[in-house]
Amino acid sequence: MNLHDHPDFDAHESVTCINDQRAGLKAIIAVHNTHLGPALGGCRYFPYGNTAQAMTDVLRLSRGMSYKNALARLPFGGGKSVIIGDPRRDKRDVQFEALGEAVHALNGQYVVAEDSGTTPEDMRIVARKTPFVSGVEDSASGGDPSPSTALGVFKGIKAALAHHCGSESLAGKTVAIQGVGKVGFALARLIRNEGGTVFASDLYAPSLDKAIAELGVIPRTHDDILSQPCDVLAPCAMGGVISATTIPTLNTRIIAGAANNQLGTASDGEALRQRGILYCPDFVVNAGGVIEIQHQRLGSDALTRSKALEIIPANLMQIFATADGEHIDTERAAVALAHRILGKPRSNPATQCAA
């Protein structure tokens, strides 16, 4: 398939495919939009079944980053990178050095950060080869943004509860979290600390065991968690879990989670609206991490960083009001708002796929 014919290609400015046999690196870097500034987005390390799956993911993720950064009012465009492999088995320092070289070759068009499957330490290795990296341990650029991602989702959940249920209180509420890795675990802790009950699942047994032992979450299987009766469903693992297949089985009033690309297709937002389920668009509610990264770069103090996260519930309330007033789904309302902030895209995007 020609890249321009890919269903998820959306006038991306550049797509770079990397196949470095010396380093054992198979990766893709996608830059969606740099209208507001250099494309900032994390590097996901995941065992995709094939390159086509990786391409679909990176195209969708990079577009989501354009929306996320725009709605967070950050001076960045949207980009993403993915590495094909198992991060628990295949990681090598030389891979991240090679990734750094590829990022550097883009001359500042893309700024890489950590994401699912990568760490601040991995980004430190990338930084050996390029300054276009954020989230680096023991440097002015900071470290792990996942606690801020979790806090942003938490604030989003409270906003959704206030809008949909009349009170933002989590006391006595039930939340089902799919995925209790770094972000999901931190979110579960915040909810438990406010008196909420947490059901949780994770395909990686040690992560679920830790959440059970330390937080008292109630375990569920990774599939059953989606149909668990609850006030809030929080997808915090991989995307695509809210789809035509799963929507009829959902037993929740609100969806608000940290996972990217939660909807299988754009039409799933309308299907949720028809069922009376309030969906918090993922690129709105999970923006805490990228907001944190920016304030790490600026050297902001803790109070400033915390206040910056208030844009998440503020955005959601605006989106909810638009969706209610125009009788449209919240995903559509959020995308429209992002497009207004992004403004007119560049007129001469240069798309490439270089091996």
Question: Where are the regions a protein language model picked out?
Answer:
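N-terminal ligand-binding/catalytic initiation module
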Residues: 1-141
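Adenosine-phosphate binding glycine-rich loop
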Residues: 161, 253-355
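Hydrophobic beta-strand scaffold residues
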Residues: 110, 198, 219, 278-279, ...
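Glycine-rich phosphate/diphosphate-binding loop of Rossmann-like nucleotide-binding domains
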Residues: 144-232
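Rossmann-like adenosine-cofactor binding region
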Residues: 203-284
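Flexible, glycine/charged-enriched surface loops at secondary-structure junctions
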Residues: 69-74, 109-114, 165-174, 222, ...
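Short glycine/serine/threonine-rich phosphate/pyrophosphate-binding segments
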Residues: 147, 182-187, 241-245, 263-265, ...
